[in-house]
């Protein structure tokens, strides 16, 4: 699975994530430059991550140095934050993202969560007063306008359930290209993957290794005994087994490491396949969602429970 391996729609199958705890512009810029040198071409960011500007700086520097021939050789994904998930704020939000990136377009623009907040509310913790009802139709019509204006080559969503996708598809004139969600061997998303495949929506996996080390992540994936046993028997790392498994599901995936050796390891999962028996063993791993999105739930807000946020799909 090289970094240049792409879906039928031209999206690289593997991308580098840039969500970090607190702004770290220079380390991000250096890491993205190093990743480009290693071979990554897809970079995943978001307004909420505050990493758009250093990614743009790294991309411009890579073009100047000849590491890539032009910006067109890179695939940039960014996301609409909840406080801009309002009809009249979507296009301006993307224009601000493009200013941050110093680019004329993004390759993919996603609705970050099916959640709306009052304009200006950016950082957790959130209160019930921060949330307002999510007008999916209005937000999506504005996303479609982003595409028509040429500001986003493709549009999609993140953290959408089957039910929410069904609702979106009932009125969308431009269907979502991608649904970016948590996918890993501990949260395999079989139902959602089957639904998306049937609707022509590409599933993109975030936290394929369980997001160990983040404020919401877990050791459950990397510490899974089945994965450790498969890795040992195949002479691979647990990370490589996880990424190979996601890849063999047909999903795109977003991995995050600023360490060059790990960057290379995360790309080095070609030349072997998991056996049917290994797939069977992985399928039997007890399932539990890691990123529950609890911060978007409030007894006085639009989503009063996790069941409502995920439409029972947890």
Curated annotation (Swiss-Prot):
PROSITE patterns assigned to the protein according to its UniProt record, in alphabetical order: ALDOKETO_REDUCTASE_1, ALDOKETO_REDUCTASE_3
Tissue: Mostly expressed in root tissues, observed in mesocotyl and embryonic roots, seedling roots, crown and seedling leafes, mature bracts, anthers, pistil, caryopsis and embryos.
Inducers of expression: Up-regulated under iron-deficient conditions in root and shoot tissues.
Entry-linked Gene3D superfamilies: NADP-dependent oxidoreductase domain
Sequence segments annotated as region (Disordered): 1-21
Residues involved in substrate binding: 112
InterPro entries in UniProt: AKR (IPR020471), AKR4A/B (IPR044497), Aldo/ket_reductase_CS (IPR018170), NADP_OxRdtase_dom (IPR023210), NADP_OxRdtase_dom_sf (IPR036812)
UniProt key word Iron: yes
pH dependence: Optimum pH is 8-9.
Pathway noted in the entry: Siderophore biosynthesis
This protein's GO CC annotations: cytosol
Binding site for NADP(+): 44, 158-159, 180, 258-266, 273-281
Protein family (similarity comment): Belongs to the aldo/keto reductase family.
Function: Catalyzes the reduction of a 3''-keto intermediate during the biosynthesis of 2'-deoxymugineic acid (DMA) from L-Met. Involved in the formation of phytosiderophores (MAs) belonging to the mugineic acid family and required to acquire iron.
Name the UniProt record assigns to this protein: Deoxymugineic acid synthase 1-A
Annotated gene: DMAS1-A
